[in-house]
A protein has these predicted regions:
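The feature marks proteins involved in alpha-glucan
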Residues: 7-88, 93-101, 108
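Aromatic-lined carbohydrate-recognition surfaces of secreted/lumenal glycan-active proteins
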Residues: 126, 276-281
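Beta-strand-rich binding/interaction modules
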Residues: 1-2, 25
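Extended, compositionally biased low-complexity polar/Lys-Gly-rich tracts
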Residues: 3, 10-12, 113, 117
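Structural signal for conserved beta-strand scaffold positions within catalytic alpha/beta enzyme cores
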Residues: 3-6, 148
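Substrate-binding/active-site clefts of carbohydrate-active enzymes
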Residues: 48, 68-81, 90-272
Length: 281
């Protein structure tokens, strides 16, 4: 284990010599009272395949993109007046291998899906969440690794190959993105240091009864920065062409899915989540 140093800014710093791609790691957080929390890195670029959940060191600087033509013209092909038709797909269930494997790799799916959607005349695919998540049954909508493409289908560079292939076939890629809530898995964002850093302390504000998940505290600048930076990350590092935000209604209304007494009104007595609205703007 390596001890982190607390800087005057309030940010912790750590340097570990000899770290290599493929190394796994977690944060061990010791709280007052002697409690210890083992957490995955919220900013990790890769994670172990479930049910394992450690973060994985990767090098994102080696992939050689070949989608220059698409990137140059997408401002026009995705303009306000451009015709767009979108094919929504869950990569894990769209097509299954017949050789006993659970899933195809991103690199295998890419040419098959590109050919299929081109034949049907679609301009874009919308991927149900590919960010890392522990529960298959959630279809990816309960994210624990916001900065990591799920290891179910391969590595980060495998996913870059997928994006690259779609673009070379003139198919845009929209990513489903879930800034509305996150799961309670103990290795994730929930009570990250033993306190509520990403969520509200009051369960009437921080708990989502429909899905059993936690609601982001959009009033915290650190939380907003984490999410906004994440959206920009997928655009920069994976050449995503757009995002589709999931469960927006649950973000907008404080009483969404709740009964009287289960929610807290805003400062004006209304049910609008003012911080979430400001975040969306």
């Amino acid at each position: 284990a390596y001890q982190m140093n607390l800087l005057e800014s309030g940010i912790y710093e750590l340097f570990i010599p000899g770290v290599r791609a493929g190394d796994i790691y977690k944060y061990e957080i010791k709280a007052k009272g002697g409690l210890t929390y083992l957490k995955s890195d919220p900013y990790a670029n890769a994670a172990q395949l479930r049910p394992n959940n450690a973060s994985v060191v990767v090098d994102l600087g080696k992939y050689a993109w070949q989608d220059e033509n698409w990137m140059k013209k997408r401002g026009v092909t995705q303009g306000d007046k451009a015709p767009i038709s979108v094919y929504e797909v869950h990569l894990g269930s769209w097509k299954k291998p017949d050789d006993g494997r659970e899933f195809y790799n991103y690199r295998e799916i890419a040419p098959m899906l590109a050919s299929y959607v081109k034949e049907l005349g679609y301009t874009h695919v919308e991927l149900m969440p590919v960010m890392e998540h522990p529960l298959d049954e959630s279809w990816g909508y309960q994210v624990t690794g916001y900065y990591a493409p799920t290891a179910r289908y391969g590595t980060p560079d495998d996913f870059r190959y997928f994006m690259d292939t779609m673009h070379q076939n003139d198919i845009g890629v929209i990513l489903d993105w879930v800034p509305a809530h996150f799961p309670r898995d103990t290795f994730g964002l929930s009570a990250f240091d033993g306190t509520c850093l990403y969520e509200h302390f009051d369960p009437r504000q921080g708990s989502h009864p429909h899905w059993g998940t936690l609601i982001y505290n959009y009033g915290r600048p650190e939380v907003k920065n984490f999410l906004i930076a994440n959206a920009l990350f997928w655009a920069k590092e994976y050449h995503a062409d757009g995002i589709r935000m999931d469960a927006v209604a649950s973000m907008l209304y404080l009483d969404y899915g709740k009964q009287d007494g289960e929610w807290v009104a805003n400062i004006y007595g209304g049910n609008e989540n003012l911080e979430a609205i400001e975040f969306l703007k």
